[in-house]
Curated annotation (Swiss-Prot):
InterPro entries the record matches: Restrct_endonuc_typeI_TRD (IPR000055), Restrct_endonuc_typeI_TRD_sf (IPR044946), Type-I_RS_S_subunit (IPR052021)
The organism of origin for this protein: Mycoplasma pneumoniae (strain ATCC 29342 / M129 / Subtype 1)
Family, as annotated: Belongs to the type-I restriction system S methylase family.
Induction entry: Detected at low levels after 6 and 96 hours growth, there are fewer copies at 96 hours (at protein level).
A biological-process GO annotation: DNA restriction-modification system
Stretches that traverse the bilayer: none
Subunit and partners: The methyltransferase is composed of M and S polypeptides.
UniProt keywords, alphabetically: DNA-binding, Restriction system
Pfam families associated with the record: Methylase_S (PF01420)
Entry protein name: Putative type I specificity subunit S.MpnORF507P
Entry remark concerning the domains of this protein: Contains two DNA recognition domains, each specifying recognition of one of the two defined components of the target sequence.
Disulfide bonds: none
Role of this protein: The specificity (S) subunit of a type I methyltransferase (MTase); this subunit dictates DNA sequence specificity. The single R subunit has multiple frameshifts and is probably not expressed.
Record-level Gene Ontology MF annotations: DNA binding
Length: 363
């Protein structure tokens, strides 16, 4: 089997996106995606009413999370932090190119400075091996199947998130009380305790063992994103944590002993209130920072926030409905997360071995 080696500049037209701001997207809203240097949400920055590219392309991120490669097929625009390749060689499959290039780009990312970069001049000189077009198409089709399955699983996850949001909005709204009386309470009036995390302890370790077994919690968007583990704990009761810095307003239910740090707010309600209900009520609360710059949610500010609360029986009923809906998508150990991770690892495994096989075919 003949293997041909080409530099990107020899088989592609190399372009770059243009300056498209969030303000521009807001003022020119439409149906055509704008791809950026982002790596989440398929790299989408937003949608506008015009497009700069139409057809099959390969894009890569030039700044920040530089070197992440995407296959594009459709009408779209790209920001100035997004490089765009248009294949001009009829013996090259664009999707195969995307898979091949994604294995190579990490080697060429320039990491000096605060933002990693991968510019057009560097990409132009990257060399890739290409088998006959028919083989390229078969490999691309095979690897694409893993991406398609992952996309289906992620769509199911989004569906579950929207389902929870719908029922949460409906059940927590006093307008849908169906005769049930809701009363407005300040958080300070329903709290048994409200505590704030201090500095990260000097005596801790990253890994959990029999001695260092209590998680150190701080401000994070992930429930299980721990700073490390401590020999001691401060909170032993069931509680609700609320991020007060950075990821302000990230709310999690905690049913284990832990040590809070870095101004994390810990809320323990009085026993006459259902903690599971209050968890969902606080998740629905829009917390705001105080002060300029990064700012923070202060203890005094937190205490003054208000929530509508029905009878204890109604609280229990609402919690019984919302709990399973929430934990279906929030639990990282749930099957769909494991399935997504498995498909990702499978694709990486076959991708690496298929392209190693191609390299081994070179004479």
């Amino acid at each position: 089997m003949q293997i041909r080696t080409y530099k990107i500049k020899d088989i592609c037209d190399i372009q770059r996106g243009r300056g498209i701001t969030k303000e521009y997207i807001k003022n020119n809203s439409g149906k055509y995606p704008v791809y950026s240097a982002a790596t989440t949400n398929n790299g989408e920055l937003g949608f506008i009413n015009t497009y700069d590219f139409a057809g099959e392309y390969v894009t890569w991120t030039t700044n920040g999370y530089a070197g992440v490669v995407f296959y594009r097929n459709g009408k779209f625009s790209a920001s100035q932090d997004c490089g765009v390749l248009k294949v001009r060689n009829k013996e090259i499959n664009a999707q195969f190119l995307a898979f091949a290039l994604s294995l190579k780009t990490p080697q060429f990312v320039h990491n000096l400075g605060s933002r990693p970069k991968l510019n057009r001049k560097v990409v132009a000189e990257i060399s890739l091996d290409f088998p006959p077009l028919e083989v390229q198409e078969k490999i691309a089709h095979f690897l694409k199947s893993f991406n398609e399955l992952s996309s289906q699983l992620k769509a199911e996850l989004i569906k579950r998130q929207k389902q929870y949001a719908f029922y949460s909005d409906y059940l927590l709204n006093p307008k849908h009380s169906q005769g049930e009386e809701y009363k407005l309470f300040k958080l300070k009036d329903i709290a048994k305790k409200i505590l704030v995390g201090g500095e990260k302890p000097s005596d801790f370790q990253k890994e959990k063992d029999q001695v260092y077994k209590y998680p150190i919690l701080s401000n994070s968007r992930k429930a299980d994103d721990f700073l490390g583990y401590s020999k001691t704990f401060r909170i032993a009761e069931k509680s609700i944590t609320v991020s007060a810095r950075g990821t302000i307003g990230a709310v999690f239910y905690r049913d284990f002993s832990y040590l809070p740090a870095v101004s994390l707010i810990c809320f323990i309600p009085k026993p006459e209130f259902n903690i599971n209900f209050l968890f969902h009520a606080l998740k629905a609360t829009k917390f705001h920072k105080q002060g300029s710059g990064t700012g923070q949610l202060t203890m005094a500010q937190f205490k003054e926030y208000q929530v509508y609360i029905p009878s204890l029986k109604k609280q229990q009923e609402i919690a019984a409905t919302l709990d399973p809906l929430y934990y279906i998508f929030a639990n990282s150990n749930w099957g769909i997360y494991k399935e997504i991770e498995l498909r990702k690892k499978q694709m990486q495994y076959y991708q690496e071995r298929l392209f190693q096989w191609i390299e081994n075919q070179k004479v």
